[in-house]
A protein has these predicted regions:
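Short, well-ordered beta-to-alpha junction loops that form the rim of enzyme active sites
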Residues: 58-61, 82-85, 154-158, 197
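Generic beta-sheet signal
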Residues: 5, 147-157
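Acidic, low-complexity terminal tails and accessory targeting/binding regions
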Residues: 1-2, 80, 87-102, 149, ...
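Glycine-rich phosphate-binding loop signature in dinucleotide/nucleotide-binding domains
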Residues: 50-52, 143-149
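Alpha-helical packing segments of well-folded alpha/beta enzyme cores
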Residues: 40-44, 64-67, 128, 132-143
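Active-site-proximal alpha-helix that buttresses catalytic centers in soluble enzyme cores
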Residues: 2-81
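Phosphate-handling substructures
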Residues: 31-32, 75-134, 194-196, 206, ...
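Short, active-site-adjacent cap segments at secondary-structure transitions
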Residues: 14, 64-65, 87-89, 159-161
Length: 212
């Protein structure tokens, strides 16, 4: 029986819209969604609400949780925080290990968090590009083996590319723009990509794709 894996990137982030936010932020490497990012997340939810998704996994960074939460509300599903979907822990992007909100704080703001779920893969800072590729491929393969229903992964530009390549193999170009959708259909080690960074559900898209 074939499985569908949906892979989405978070919506627009506040520091992309207001770069000065970084200078005074308490957690500068964990920006929230921008105002238009929330609109994108809602549009993503509208796009996916008729799909037969059984599980939603998201990176523990705030922007991915906020994006996934919009989808989870429309699909009436819990959120599983999976560190294997985290941002690339690139020391050129982050001078120190990024601080994210604790589960206790997140629970106060996101009632759909599945507190019984623990991450299957946990990255370490700093992380090379090779380690990123291995980590994201491993979490994608781990999740499709453990959860055989249709699933949604919500991550970052780097983890959208890495999880996709981890399943389809090779080195395909992935259009990992903000709030894009990748759709993979297959089983075991035989996957094909039906959508590559689709943004047809968005009312507004970025003019140039950036990861950081």
């Amino acid at each position: 029986m074939h499985q569908t894996v949906w892979i989405a990137r978070h919506g627009n982030r506040l520091d992309f819209v207001n770069p000065d936010w970084f200078n005074t932020a308490k957690r500068p490497y964990d920006p929230p969604l921008s105002e238009d990012g929330f609109i994108q997340a809602q549009e993503l939810g509208q796009r996916l609400k008729s799909e037969k998704i059984s599980h939603i996994f998201c990176s523990p960074f705030l922007r991915t949780i906020q994006t996934a939460d919009c989808v989870a509300e429309m699909l009436d599903l819990p959120l599983k925080l999976e560190a294997g979907l985290s941002e690339w822990l690139n020391p050129e992007w982050m001078r120190t290990k990024p601080e994210t909100l604790s589960r206790k704080v997140l629970q106060e703001h996101f009632s759909r968090l599945d507190l019984g779920y623990t991450s299957r893969v946990v990255p370490e800072y700093p992380e090379t590009m090779g380690q990123l590729g291995e980590r994201t491929a491993r979490i994608a393969r781990t999740l499709v083996e453990e959860f055989t229903e249709d699933i949604l992964l919500v991550g970052h530009g780097a983890s959208v590319c890495g999880t996709t390549k981890g399943l389809v193999g090779g080195n395909p170009y992935i259009n990992a723009s903000l709030c894009c959708l990748v759709k993979l259909v297959g089983q075991s080690k035989n996957w094909h990509m039906e959508l590559n960074g689709d943004v047809s559900h968005l009312s507004s898209t970025e003019s140039q794709v950036r990861f950081n």
